[in-house]
Amino acid sequence: MNQSVNGSGMKRMALINDLSCFGKCSLSVAMPILSAYGVETVPLPTAILSTHTADGFGDYVMRDMTNEMKAFAAHWRQLQIKFDGICTGFFGSVEQMHFAKDFLRDFAGEDTLVVVDPVLGDNGALYGCFTDEYVQAMRALCESAQLITPNRTEAALLAGCGMDAPVETLLKALTVKNVIITGVRRGEEIGYCARLSGHYVEIFKPCLPQTLHGTGDVFVSALCGELMNGKDMPRALTDAAEFCDKCIRKTEKRGESHWYGLAFEDVLKEERDL
């Protein structure tokens, strides 16, 4: 039974990421946003967490899903499922990244959009749970992508450059065809610097004094939604950045704790006139 498309011809995207059950990030953000873009989402959780990992929630519970990932993929392989898009995020181990490379080999067709959001670190440092071997495995996974979306710290780690390397240097050092570096600071602004099919693109917005948890997940989800609806990468970047900025402003207006997540639901509701 070939399940390359669903009955309506709707685009289908596999999401390989963690599921934080409480708090807004990763799969709990990607699934509703992509659904609002008219994209069927197929989650493949790398881990399930009681909450996201920000300090506001204290000690969280986490369950590794490596064995389940392999079993789910084996069943999907029997069904001959193919995907129009595949987006990866957090991995709990090098083993999971090796699995992801095999998953791309088995489930991506010639026209499948492959996006890797290489979760590695932030604020100039590798996350404490990761190792140099993990960085090397992420580098190898990125080679299979048409587009990667690292923040500035992750871009430096992938490129093997110092944390103070200019963004232009990072973009030249990264060999993936399309790269969007997120969270780039410029004075009182923050934004995106990209190399898309050889062309440099940048977008900046006013910077808030606090960090908002899950902003990158909201951006990547909207970016995938734009791309899956046929927009070219520069236009998709522009529109996804605008969507993310609207979510930030809505979160400001609500006065929600910045560590909880963005009020993206308000923007989806407003844009669909509900």
At which residue positions do the language-model features occur?
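Charged C-terminal helix
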Residues: 234-274
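Short pre-catalytic strand/loop immediately N-terminal to key active-site residues, enriched for Gly-Thr
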Residues: 21, 200-214
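Conserved phosphate/ATP/ADP-binding segment of small-molecule kinases
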Residues: 128-201, 210, 234
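Short, small-residue alpha-helix embedded
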Residues: 209-233, 237
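A short, flexible beta-alpha/helix-coil linker loop
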Residues: 120-123, 155-156, 208
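Conserved N-terminal subdomain of the carbohydrate kinase-like
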Residues: 2-116, 120-123, 128, 265, ...
